[in-house]
């Protein structure tokens, strides 16, 4: 009988610890990933979910993906788009090394990273990458969009946005 009572208390204590651990994980996950509205974020008048003008873009048939086509702008080959094969809508954009194109927030490649921090919400996560690069990550939970801004020495090097 004493053995049964001892096991009962052990089971209750283990259950309480697991419940508190799960609660702590949920609270930390929601606190770390605060929301930023990215549904209207544009690079050169294009946003996630829009259709592209195929006359301005060329498709890369050498890149084979199951669900997506890869396009780049004819005039700006460093502006790359991922387009859903079924819907024809943009699901991802990447801008690298092209200082002519800018976002609707009035920043572009080569600008100071403080422009990004001022124009966007303070709801970002900063990560250190290799070779001195860092990234700012903005998450839009409602529209399921992620924005990555890669920078080095406080200068924007890459802008990437895509559906989660």
Can you describe what each PLM-predicted range is?
Residues 1-19, 26:
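N-terminal Sec-pathway targeting helices
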Residues 24, 28, 89-90:
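N-proximal short alpha-helices
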Residues 26-47:
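Ser/Thr/Pro/Gly-rich low-complexity linker/stalk segments immediately outside membranes or between
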Residues 36-39, 92-102:
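Acidic/histidine-rich, surface-exposed loop or edge segments in extracytoplasmic proteins
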Residues 40, 45-87, 99, 107-155, ...:
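A cross-family detector of function-defining hotspots
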């Amino acid at each position: 009988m004493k053995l049964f009572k001892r096991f009962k208390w052990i089971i209750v204590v283990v259950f309480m610890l697991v419940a508190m651990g799960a609660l702590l994980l949920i609270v930390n996950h929601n606190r770390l990933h605060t929301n930023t509205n990215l549904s209207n974020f544009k690079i050169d008048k294009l946003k996630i979910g829009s259709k592209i003008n195929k006359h301005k873009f060329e498709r890369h048939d050498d890149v084979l993906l199951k669900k997506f086509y890869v396009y780049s702008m004819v005039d700006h080959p460093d502006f790359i788009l991922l387009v859903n094969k079924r819907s024809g809508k943009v699901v991802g954009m990447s801008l690298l090394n092209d200082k002519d194109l800018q976002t609707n927030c009035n920043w572009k490649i080569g600008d100071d990273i403080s422009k990004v921090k001022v124009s966007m919400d303070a709801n970002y996560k900063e990560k250190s990458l290799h070779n001195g690069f860092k990234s700012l990550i903005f998450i839009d939970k409602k529209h399921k969009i992620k924005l990555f801004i890669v920078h080095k020495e406080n200068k924007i090097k890459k802008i990437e946005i895509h559906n989660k």
